[in-house]
Design a protein with these regions (language model features):
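Conserved beta-strand-loop-alpha-helix hinge in the C-terminal portion
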Residues: 76-106
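Conserved catalytic segment of ABC-fold P-loop ATPases
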Residues: 66-73
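Conserved H-loop
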Residues: 51-57
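ABC ATPase nucleotide-binding domain "signature motif"
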Residues: 2-8
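Conserved signature/switch motifs of ABC ATPase nucleotide-binding domains
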Residues: 17
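Catalytic Walker B motif of ABC-type/P-loop ATPase nucleotide-binding domains
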Residues: 22-25
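Helical segment within the ABC ATPase nucleotide-binding domain
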Residues: 36-50
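Hydrophobic anchor residue at the start of the ABC signature
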Residues: 11
Length: 119
C-alpha cells in the first residue's frame, strides 16, 4: 500500500469501532505534502459527518490551524502548555488567507520562532 492508502486503512480501522473520542497521534506525519493535504480534508469530512470529539497531536503548525478548533501549544523541557488558541474560522479554511497566516504566526511567536513576542 502507498503511504496515503496505509493512512486511510489505519483511519478506517479506528473509525470502525465508533469511538466516542477520536484520538489521532501524528496520523499524517509520514505523508508527502499533497497526500497529507488530501488526508486532512478526508479527516475533516469524516469529523463533520460524525460530529464526534477528536483530539489530534501534530508537529505541523499549518495542520493544527487548518484542522483545529482549539490549538494547545506546548514547549518542551519540561513539556507544558504555553498557549490555548481558539481558531474562530469556518470550515473549509483557506490556507492563504490573512487570518490563517495570523494564527500560524501567533503559534510561531508562542514558540519563540516569530519576529515579535505575543503576551
Amino acid at each position: 500500500l502507498s503511504g496515503g492508502m496505509a493512512q486511510r486503512v489505519a483511519l478506517v480501522r479506528t473509525l470502525i469501532n465508533e469511538p466516542e473520542i477520536l484520538l489521532l497521534d501524528e496520523p499524517l506525519g509520514a505523508l508527502d505534502e499533497f497526500t497529507r493535504m488530501n488526508m486532512q480534508d478526508e479527516i475533516l469530512n469524516i469529523w463533520s459527518q460524525k460530529k464526534q470529539l477528536a483530539l489530534m497531536v501534530t508537529h505541523s503548525i499549518d495542520e493544527a490551524v487548518y484542522m483545529g478548533t482549539r490549538v494547545l501549544v506546548m514547549e518542551s523541557n519540561p513539556g507544558r502548555i504555553v498557549a490555548d488558541i481558539r481558531i474562530d474560522e469556518d470550515f473549509p479554511r483557506d490556507r492563504s488567507s490573512a487570518s490563517f497566516v495570523e494564527y500560524r504566526n501567533e503559534i510561531l511567536n508562542r514558540l519563540h520562532f516569530g519576529g515579535k513576542k505575543t503576551e
